[in-house]
Amino acid sequence: DLLIIMLGTNDVKERFGANAACIGAGMERLIQKCKSVDCWGGKEPNILIVAPPRIKEGFHDEVMGDGCVEKSRGVAAQFQMIAARNHVHFLDAEGCEFNQIDFMHLTRHGHAQLAEKLAELVPTLL
């Protein structure tokens, strides 16, 4: 079994008031909760966390707010550090294509790119 957790780009919205470290702390809490659930048959769960692609430079809108580009840059580094500390796997989805409407949701091609990355990595983790 493999549990895959990917927090979305929405977490960098200004209204949530979370910086990359806070978003990372949220991911770490999720990992710890997943590990504490009694459904793994007495074994340590096999977990993969995925960092979303970074929001591209110059993007700003009312929904995301100021600082979303900068905050999104720090999430992958936080997730990578948290993955190492919690002995779980890490994948950076950077390079998967965002749509040009809200710059936070993947396009059809972006989903295919993420699927390719996962298809390559997941068999090595099972």
Give the ranges of each region predicted by the language model.
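Alpha-helical cap/lid subdomain in secreted, periplasmic
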Residues: 1-126
